[in-house]
UniProtKB/Swiss-Prot annotation:
GO molecular function: ADP-dependent NAD(P)H-hydrate dehydratase activity; ATP binding
Alphabetical list of Gene3D superfamilies matching this protein: 3.40.1190.20
Entry protein name: ADP-dependent (S)-NAD(P)H-hydrate dehydratase
Pfam families the record matches: Carb_kinase
HAMAP family xrefs: NADHX_dehydratase (MF_01965)
Residues the entry annotates as binding AMP: G201
Organism whose genome encodes this protein: Natrialba magadii (strain ATCC 43099 / DSM 3394 / CCM 3739 / CIP 104546 / IAM 13178 / JCM 8861 / NBRC 102185 / NCIMB 2190 / MS3)
Length: 258
C-alpha cells in the first residue's frame, strides 16, 4: 500500500490537465445529490476538473452545491439515447467516467450505449451495474453497495467468475472491503461503522475515478480507493464522532492523502 500512496505525491505542474478530468453521469429527482458527492470526492482526491451531466431539473441544485463543479444538463428527467449522446461527447473531454449514481429509471440501452462508445476507464456504480453487465467491462471498476451486486451473482454465480469472464475489477465495501480482479482477491481493513452513512458509496466512486483519471491502473485504483475512503472515514469519525456524514468524509480526503 505504501507504493500506491507514494504515487499520489507525484503531482506534475506541467499543465492544467495533469491530474485528470472526470465525467459524472447520474442523478434523478429521487436522488439529486449523488453526482455532486461523486464530483466533490474526485476533486478532493486531486482531479483538476469534474463535469457532471444531470437532468435539466437538477442543473440549478447541483451547480449551486459547489462552485468547483462543472455542470451540464440534458433535456428531460430520464437518461435516454439523446442524453447518452451528450454523455459520449463529455467523455471525449474526460480521462475517466463515473456512471450510475442516483440514475433512476435510466434506459438500459442508453447506459450500454455510453459504455460501448467510450474508451476511457469507467466506474460503474449503483443503478448502472445491472444494464452494464451486457457491455464490455474490460475498462471498468464496479462499486456496488448493498444489494447492487445481486445481478452479478445471478448472472455469473460468483465474483471470481465475473471478473475472469469480463476482465472487470470490483470493489465491495463492508467491515472488510474486498477487491476482486482476474485471479486475485485483495482485502482492505481501514474504515469505521460511520461509512454505512448515505453517500459514502458515491464518495468511493469519486475517489476511484479520480485515481483512474490520474492514470492509475484499475486494480491499484480500486485498492487505493478503498484505503483512502476507509482512512478518511476514520479521520472524520475522530473529528465529528457518531454524527459523521458523507461530506465530512470527503473533506478529510486531502488529510488522508498527505
Amino acid at each position: 500500500m505504501g507504493r500506491l500512496q507514494r504515487t499520489l505525491s507525484n503531482i506534475s505542474e506541467e499543465s492544467d490537465t495533469d491530474n485528470g478530468r472526470v465525467a459524472v453521469v447520474g442523478g434523478s429527482i429521487e436522488y439529486p445529490n449523488q453526482p455532486a458527492l461523486v464530483g466533490r470526492a474526485a476533486l478532493r482526491t486531486g482531479t483538476d476538473h469534474v463535469r457532471t451531466l444531470v437532468p435539466e431539473a437538477l442543473y440549478a441544485p447541483v451547480a449551486g452545491s459547489s462552485p468547483n463543479l462543472l455542470v451540464s444538463p440534458y433535456d428531460g428527467d430520464q437518461f435516454d439515447q439523446d442524453a447518452a449522446a451528450d454523455a459520449v461527447d463529455i467523455c471525449e473531454w474526460a480521462d475517466a467516467l463515473v456512471i450510475g449514481p442516483g440514475l433512476v429509471d435510466a434506459e438500459a440501452d442508453a447506459i450500454r450505449d455510453v459504455l460501448e462508445r467510450t474508451d476511457i476507464p469507467v466506474v460503474v456504480d449503483a443503478l448502472a451495474i445491472e444494464p452494464a453487465l451486457e457491455s464490455d467491462l474490460s475498462r471498468a471498476v464496479l462499486t456496488p453497495s448493498g444489494s447492487e451486486d445481486g445481478p452479478i451473482y445471478e448472472a455469473y454465480g460468483s465474483l471470481r467468475a465475473f471478473t475472469e469472464e469480463t476482465g472487470a475489477v470490483i470493489t465491495l465495501t463492508g467491515g472488510v472491503d474486498v477487491i476482486v480482479t482476474t485471479g486475485e482477491r485483495l482485502e482492505n481493513d481501514t474504515g469505521t461503522s460511520a461509512l454505512t452513512v448515505a453517500g459514502t458509496g458515491d464518495t468511493l466512486a469519486g475517489i476511484t475515478a479520480s485515481l483512474l483519471g490520474q492514470e492509475m491502473d484499475r486494480q491499484d485504483a480500486a485498492e487505493l480507493g478503498a484505503w483512502i475512503l476507509g482512512k478518511s472515514g476514520e479521520l472524520a469519525t475522530a473529528e465529528y464522532g457518531p454524527g459523521v456524514v458523507a461530506t465530512d468524509v470527503i473533506e478529510c480526503i486531502p488529510k488522508t492523502i498527505r
